Amino acid sequence: MRVVVAEDAVLLRAGLVRLLTEAGHEVVADVDTAEDLLRAVEQHAPDFALVDVRLPPTFTDEGIRAAVLLRAQHPGIAVLVLSQYVEERYAAELIASRRDGLGYLLKDRVADVEQFLESVETVGAGGTVLDPEVVAQLLVRSRHRQDLELLSPREHEVLGLMAQGLSNASIAANLFLTESSVEKNIRSVFTKLG
């Protein structure tokens, strides 16, 4: 897979590039700003973008805004967002874009290299990977609007297992479904929960 990495922390960026390269991916660009990310995508036409939520110059939401823009302008690119915190508004917008190949992980919860690389592969193959904390934050937001009533029984089951931190493959095994069925349910859940 051809990958662009956008991360402002030099050591973390170098580590991500090395991990991805050793896993057999071609890192076509590694950048430290959202502006450079957008340029790199135009120049290199990657299959996958790994994006930090907070990038220079303000370190607020430049990365996540760039990820939302990437998904709108380049729907074929898979996007995995890394963050220290859940940015609810943008996470919901990113998830609601209804395109395949999406992930949102919290940096401090990515403690296992194999699990991280599995997430990269899942997102790169068109799947969805969401950190349990992202799921929990969006659930809290939705509870206030009674949106959970819109979910089917199967969607409730999938959401509950996601909130426990299970991977798409584990959810599929638990519910005797295919991974693509799980991913379809995940997209449906977040479309309904907006």
List the model feature ranges, each with a label.
Residues 7:
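Conserved acidic carboxylate
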Residues 10-29:
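Two-component/phosphorelay signaling modules centered on CheY-like receiver
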Residues 30-48, 58:
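Acidic, metal-coordinating helix/loop segments flanking the phosphotransfer/catalytic sites
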Residues 52, 83:
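Active-site residues of response regulator receiver
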Residues 60-76, 88, 92-97:
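Short amphipathic alpha-helix used as the core "switch/output" element in two-component signaling
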Residues 92-149:
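Short, flexible helix-to-coil linker/hinge segments that flank and couple to helix-turn-helix
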Residues 154-155:
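The N-cap/first-turn positions of alpha helices
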Residues 165-194:
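Recognition helix of helix-turn-helix DNA-binding domains
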